[in-house]
């Protein structure tokens, strides 16, 4: 039986993804702070911002299985607000969950995959990694850092039979929107702050379904020759293509 380990599977994209893999007959391990064990999914408590918690969670998984086929780093959240009024602590928290959480997971599972001689690691990134969104700068930066990490890692571990990919979804309708930590300090100076965040949240609430993204994860997990980067959603593939073809000055003006 193939195995999946996924972080951040208690809700949203992660929950739909572990449910899909379980339906496909995989043994599924879901790591988060608030998930629940079901007949098909084994939940293990894990805080991706804590080294000890991550190592202990992966150790628990390996007490229950002798191999890992696919690992998906999906835990994440978002903050919004002007760069000028974002504290270093807020920025560090964003990176600690989104980037360093992914890094901790990769470090924890790589020795296992290296020893078994195969495995696949998939990182959840975002179209925001390619298109830096105003008032969502640190979220964009954390996802861009994940892309850079994944591309480098793919070359480092290819000889061990390990494949690494990134999935960059566009807007997806989940509880992620309501969970965003919004900093409205400076709204009297940055007049476009409220309207920019409102537009962003409206787009997210009317975005793609979690089922679509879960199916994309499954396609990446089972692909014979997985690509390094996938973009979720046709319109977002067009956006990312135009970002590469058009002058950066024009793209940045359009995004802004």
Where are these regions (language model features)?
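SDR active-site lid
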Residues: 159-227
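A short, exposed helix-loop element centered on a Lys and neighboring polar residues
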Residues: 106-107, 151
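N-terminal Rossmann NAD(P)H-binding glycine-rich loop of SDR-like oxidoreductase domains
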Residues: 10, 18
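Substrate-binding pocket helix/loop in short-chain dehydrogenase/reductase
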Residues: 82-83, 90-92
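Active-site helix of classical SDR
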Residues: 106, 142-145
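The beta1-alpha1 cofactor-binding region of Rossmann-like NAD(H)/NADP(H)-dependent oxidoreductases
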Residues: 46-56, 88
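Residue(s) in the substrate-gating loop at a strand-loop-helix junction
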Residues: 126
């Amino acid at each position: 039986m193939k195995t999946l380990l996924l972080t951040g599977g208690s809700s949203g994209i992660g929950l739909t993804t572990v449910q899909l893999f379980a339906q496909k007959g995989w043994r599924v391990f879901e790591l988060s702070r608030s998930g629940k064990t079901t007949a098909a999914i084994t939940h293990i408590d894990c805080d991706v911002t804590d080294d000890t918690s991550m190592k202990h969670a992966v150790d628990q998984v390996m007490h229950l299985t002798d191999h890992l086929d696919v690992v998906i780093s999906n835990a994440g959240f978002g903050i919004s607000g002007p760069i000028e009024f974002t504290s270093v602590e807020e920025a560090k928290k964003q990176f600690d969950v989104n980037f360093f959480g992914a890094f901790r997971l990769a470090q924890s599972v790589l020795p296992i995959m290296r020893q078994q001689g195969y495995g696949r690691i998939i990182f959840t990134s975002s179209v925001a990694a390619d298109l830096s969104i105003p008032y969502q700068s640190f979220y964009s930066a954390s996802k861009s850092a994940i892309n850079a990490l994944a591309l480098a890692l793919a070359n480092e571990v290819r000889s061990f039979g390990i494949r690494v990919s990134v999935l960059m979804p566009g807007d997806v309708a989940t509880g992620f929107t309501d969970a965003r930590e919004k900093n409205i300090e400076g709204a009297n100076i940055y007049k476009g702050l409220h309207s920019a965040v409102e537009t962003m949240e409206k787009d997210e609430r009317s975005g793609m379904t979690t089922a679509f993204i879960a199916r994309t994860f499954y396609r990446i997990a089972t692909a014979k020759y997985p690509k390094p980067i996938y973009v979720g959603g046709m319109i977002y593939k067009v956006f990312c293509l135009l970002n590469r073809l058009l002058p950066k000055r024009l793209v940045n003006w359009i995004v802004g």
